[in-house]
Amino acid sequence: MINQENNDLYDLNEALQVENLTLNDYEEICKRLKKKPNRTELGMFGVMWSEHCCYRNSKPLLSKFPTKGKNVLVGPGENAGVIDVGNNQKLVFKIESHNHPSAIEPFQGAATGVGGILRDIFTMGARPIAVLNSLRFGNLDKSSNVDLLRGVVSGIAHYGNCVGVPTVGGEIDFDDSYSGNPLVNVMALGLLETEEIVCSGAKNVGSPVLYVGNTTGRDGVGGASFASSELTTTSLDDRPAVQVGDPFVEKSLIEACLDAFKTGDVIAAQDMGAAGLTCSSAEMAANGNLGISIDLDLVPSREDDMSSYQYLLSESQERMLFVVKEEKINDLIEKFNKWGLYASVIGEVIGTNEVIISHKGKIVAQIPTSALSDDTPVNFHNVINNPPDDLLNKWEWKENDLPEIHEQKIFSLKENKKFSFQEIILKLLSNPSIASKRWIYKQYDSQVQANTVFKPGKSDAAVVRLREQYKKNKSKVFSGVAASVDCNSRWVALDPFRGSIAAVAESARNVSCVGAEPVAITNNLNFSSPESEIGYWQLSSSCNGITEACKALETPVTGGNVSLYNESKNKDNLITPINPTPVIGMVGKIDNIEKAISCEWKNIDDQIWLIGSYKSDTTIAASSYLEYFHGEITGRPPKIDLLDEKFCQSFLRNAILNSLVVSSHDISDGGLAIALAESCILSAKGATIELKKDINREDNLLFAEGGSRIIFSINKIKQNEWLNYLKQNQINFPSSVYVKKIGHVSSETLKINIQDKNICNIRVEELSEKFNNSISDYF
């Protein structure tokens, strides 16, 4: 037992287990403090030294990312990244995860995930203008996964709809690896409303520290430590570690904070997210190279007899911490009270670099700021030199391993019978990972604020008008921003390096497909335990891939989130890790949103074209077709030639800006056939496609993935203009990039011919039925 001067008795081994700390950590803490920590101090170290707060396992890998660029104003280190989007406007954006809380309390876990990322945005002085989400669940044939999906979607919808921020897009995938550990990643965008970016570093010794927002309770205590450990069969007992959100308080907080920031009387701001008051005070002090003292007796609370430990580790929602001008404190408190928010001076900035906490007249914690924030432990791991043997074996897979095609039919290794290509297209369209997510996004308010250009599902990336709502300017606003979240986790599982390159490339491609220029990314690295040899190799390889792609595409990393220990343990102590899932949130700028285009065909007889790269692999390996039709997750994912990728995107964007291209859609899950079908479904128009059999297998032509490929349509009245444009630009084409006409838009049927033989003739109505009802049928 440890006995401290404040009679704080605790069992050391039990306390270390609760705080997810090691004995080595404890010895290091004693060295930093030059004494043994009391229970409150140990709890503060527990959350601040967790992976969630200090990235102790991933920090060496994150340092490789490119973080500077011509448009980047604020990179990693602040609450969110900031880029210049022109016209004296600044976009603030970030992605965060709420995986473990959503696993045990899906509604509140997802809802507070939305609330937390919104606070990161408006803490910088920006009004939130859009939310996107990237979700992963186990397959829906298991009822518990259906319940998780229902709860998470309801939570996102509830919070986003009530707070008045549109949910404009996202992605969702289903795989058994997520059955015990779903992923809930939320990305938010905001438009700066203040003259200066509001930063988090404390300034001016003696300045008051102001607490604003909701009261503090016991909900969410230890949430950061909980988020940094694996899920087990007893994780439901950790429900108190899940926060409870109130979107109506958040709405008041947004308006009050932006109002206060515009006065210039707020010196620094930090939201109370993970690790609550501990993290916000420590980071403000460290970022300002000063200290902070706090009296917990002054903190507005909603429960009686809370301990100092509970005050400091509570993750009650909708709370902020400010450093403010002393002479303006009364004006600010009055402003916040007007919005129905609690506002109380709870401390001050001090000259010594430490966080000092008082409670009931006694100092209960006194810790150097560097020990909590800057100089936190780093766990170094050895990276294996070669990929695991099971992956090397899978990379040996060849398309010739599949059954031969006879009379336009192929034998399914999964279902042990033959199917026509027409039947395969319908089967792929009905797979929940490919099918329409309409059941999900119809629950979201995507039109609130009246700036959403395309409804969810209509375009490869969301497009939002950059209208400054606080200005009473009635002139029309043309500038906009595009955003997309992407990751093919099957590819990353089979090759973390190639798969992560592909995730960056696809997110940029989606942004380019609407006519926007990719500018920067935020990423959410969802991985299993870094203590596993393979788990850390996956994380390291993924970071290398992201680094290479971001450098080549000139899309620097402005920040993000790392979520490790995403694995579940069953009653037999068998661990199931998730597929590694590095979600890329890409943002791009577009000068004129009237030029932006969607995936839908526009006019009958418009020409359909295909652009792609011969250097970028086009293969059935690692494809949706191989998994969903043949039941095999194998093969090496396609290699992407990033120079060709960049050229294809740039060429397409310029054609869109010249009003020649009227629709475009990237080829991803399911290959060319599914991309064509989706454009048909979205427009309720057909397509007649003529393909040459320049390879041995028809299923490669139809269902192969990769190749940096995009289908697009040319307005029928601009076909000569398009051909002239193409001829003028042909001289700049790399020899490995091709652009070819493959068909035209028709009325009611998707008709695909290969070498003049018809292999598909499906009415759009039948395509739509399979595509639109797959997920909703589970409810």
UniProtKB/Swiss-Prot annotation:
It holds the Pfam family AIRS. ATP binds at Y55, K94, N523, G560. It is found in: Cytoplasm. Transmembrane segments: none annotated. Disulfide bonds: none annotated. The keyword Magnesium applies. It catalyses: N(2)-formyl-N(1)-(5-phospho-beta-D-ribosyl)glycinamide + L-glutamine + ATP + H2O = 2-formamido-N(1)-(5-O-phospho-beta-D-ribosyl)acetamidine + L-glutamate + ADP + phosphate + H(+). One of its GO terms (molecular function) is phosphoribosylformylglycinamidine synthase activity. Keywords: ATP-binding, Cytoplasm, Ligase, Magnesium, Metal-binding, Nucleotide-binding, Purine biosynthesis. Pathway: Purine metabolism; IMP biosynthesis via de novo pathway; 5-amino-1-(5-phospho-D-ribosyl)imidazole from N(2)-formyl-N(1)-(5-phospho-D-ribosyl)glycinamide: step 1/2. One of its GO terms (biological process) is 'de novo' IMP biosynthetic process. Mg(2+) 2 binds at D120, D271. Its EC number is 6.3.5.3. It comes from the Bacteria. Belongs to the FGAMS family. Part of the phosphoribosylformylglycinamidine synthase complex involved in the purines biosynthetic pathway. Catalyzes the ATP-dependent conversion of formylglycinamide ribonucleotide (FGAR) and glutamine to yield formylglycinamidine ribonucleotide (FGAM) and glutamate. The FGAM synthase complex is composed of three subunits. PurQ produces an ammonia molecule by converting glutamine to glutamate. PurL transfers the ammonia molecule to FGAR to form FGAM in an ATP-dependent manner. This is Phosphoribosylformylglycinamidine synthase subunit PurL. It comes from Prochlorococcus marinus (strain MIT 9301). The lineage of its organism: Bacteria, Bacillati, Cyanobacteriota, Cyanophyceae, Synechococcales.
